A protein has these predicted regions:
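A short glycine-rich, Lys/Arg-flanked "PGG" loop and its adjoining helix->strand segment in the class I
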Residues: 19-39
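Conserved class I S-adenosyl-L-methionine
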Residues: 41-64
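Rossmann-like AdoMet/SAM-dependent catalytic core
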Residues: 84, 98-193
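ATP-binding glycine-rich loop module of kinase domains
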Residues: 178-225, 260
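Conserved structural core of kinase catalytic domains
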Residues: 236-303
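C-lobe/activation-segment region of protein kinase-like
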Residues: 335-425
């Protein structure tokens, strides 16, 4: 065979292969049926996946910590760490593998990283993916992921593995895939980063459905239009070339504006952070405030017939995705790397500024300290404006979904939810500080030396006195 797939299958090996090394024998048997250049595609949970440390139950048995404790109470199903799996590959005939890491897991992957393209700091921030069982919430996974990434430990603690296995080392071109398919079919795409034989990386946006091809091809036109608009602020646009139904873009290197701001925040340089952030807010205003804003039918179709101020300004073309995560800073230039959500009709510049602030300030808890600096107010955005922009953003997200029902929107209806352990801990800690203090009278009125304290246990105290 050219390909053999083992998707959520390999872990059951010891249930039906009766041998001393069932998982090794499993791969030995399967690999005999491959062509010389054939591949095994294997997807499986990582026994040491971070989600299990954070309070998700083991996928097959539904119990807490079963896998990370080495399956002390169960038999018949086993998952493996990366080190353990490498040992199995070697014993099974020195098989070679290309390693990929689906996130949040291989069942509902939204991104797939690899050793050649690991996640960036702050990229892994999904919380609501336990659709089948109740989970504990022991810590903020996003912040722990950042710690693992900075210590080169992510491959050991990724939630799932996707392996391309062969008798020779597989040469797999994609190094990263992001799925944007929780959308209306006409907008459903995926983004792929591939590596050529010479090591050069390229980015490609591909329609997931045939009727999304027009959406992808339109990126070529948008690129040309934005290039002229952004030139006045010395901002470059990631070059786009349309090839068939795909959009091919440059792979740009550097640091995102988001990461730059985060570094300043971590160093306590908040004044410098604010100055840098607002320099880009001013660029947006300079580019997008060319004429008074008036609603168009196209605007209402996407953002709704909202009640906007009369003094807003705009341009004919509006890139609402000009947010810090999409701006790359390199030594000698500033570039916009993603401009998919550019509309060829006017959108108020203030909404673009609102999105810049919101998508930086509100999506990471560590940035909460910046809220006291009143970025919205300093940008001229009033509380009543925010209410309207929240409605616009909601309508925009509904436009993207169309008739599609996203899994994330069904979480509240499907999932048993989560138990917030920190809240429980704080509650119990507060109880531990609540004490009953009893004084006895030695003729000195209230005297701390003549007293005893008792801790409440489950809201009660029981004690005895010898009289």
């Amino acid at each position: 065979y050219d390909y053999i797939t083992l998707i959520g299958v390999f872990e059951y090996g010891e249930s039906y292969i009766r041998s001393e090394n069932p998982y090794v024998d499993f791969l030995r048997i399967i690999s005999k049926h491959l062509k010389p250049d054939g591949k095994i595609i294997l997807a499986i949970e990582n026994r040491l996946g971070l989600k299990y440390w954070a309070g998700c139950t083991e996928d097959h048995f539904g119990t807490l910590f079963e896998g990370i404790q080495g399956y002390p109470k169960t038999k018949g199903v086993k998952t493996f760490s990366r080190k353990e799996f490498n040992g199995i590959l070697e014993e099974a005939g020195n098989l070679k593998a290309d390693w990929y890491y689906p996130y949040p897991d291989y069942k509902f992957p939204m991104t797939i990283h690899s050793d050649r393209h690991l996640p960036a700091s702050g990229e892994l921030h999904m919380r609501d993916y336990n659709f089948d069982r109740l989970r504990l919430d022991l810590f903020q996974e996003s912040q722990v992921y950042n710690t693992l990434l900075s210590n080169d430990l992510y491959p050991q603690f990724a939630n799932s593995f996707l392996l391309v296995i062969g008798k020779e080392q597989p040469q797999t071109a994609p190094v990263y895939v992001k799925f944007s398919n929780e959308r209306d079919q006409k907008l459903s795409i995926y983004t792929e980063i591939s590596e050529a034989a010479d090591g050069q990386l390229t980015v490609k946006k591909v329609p997931s459905q045939k009727n999304a091809a027009a959406h992808v091809r339109n990126l070529g036109t948008i690129c040309e239009e934005l290039t002229g608009m952004y030139k006045e602020e010395e901002i470059e646009v990631n070059r786009c070339r349309i090839k068939g139904d795909c959009a091919q873009l440059e792979y740009l290197t550097g640091i995102t504006l988001e990461d730059k701001l985060d570094h300043l925040l971590e160093e306590g340089r908040t004044e410098e952070l604010e100055k840098l952030f607002f320099s880009y807010i001013q660029k947006v205003k300079n580019i997008h405030e060319k004429k008074p804003f008036e609603k168009t039918p196209e605007f209402v179709r996407v953002f709704g017939n909202v009640n906007l101020r009369s003094d807003l300004k705009c341009t004919e073309i509006s890139n609402i995705d000009f947010v810090p995560a999409n701006i790359i800073l390199s030594e000698n230039k500033v570039s916009v790397i993603d401009y998919e959500w550019t509309f060829e009709f006017p959108v108020p510049s203030q909404f673009l500024v609102y999105r810049m602030i919101f998508y930086y300030l509100e999506l990471n808890d560590k940035r909460g300290i910046l809220k006291e600096r009143d970025f919205y107010e300093k940008a001229g955005i009033l509380p009543e404006d925010i209410e309207v922009y929240v409605e616009m953003e909601h309508n925009f997200q509904q436009y993207i979904l169309g008739e599609h029902t996203a899994m994330r929107n069904m979480y509240a209806q499907i999932s048993p939810g989560r138990v917030e352990v920190e809240d429980y801990y704080r509650e119990k800690k507060q109880e531990s500080l609540e004490m009953l203090q009893i004084f006895w009278d030695n003729g000195k009125s209230f005297n701390e030396a003549d007293s005893v304290r008792y801790l409440f246990r489950n809201g009660k105290i029981q004690t005895e006195f010898e009289l």
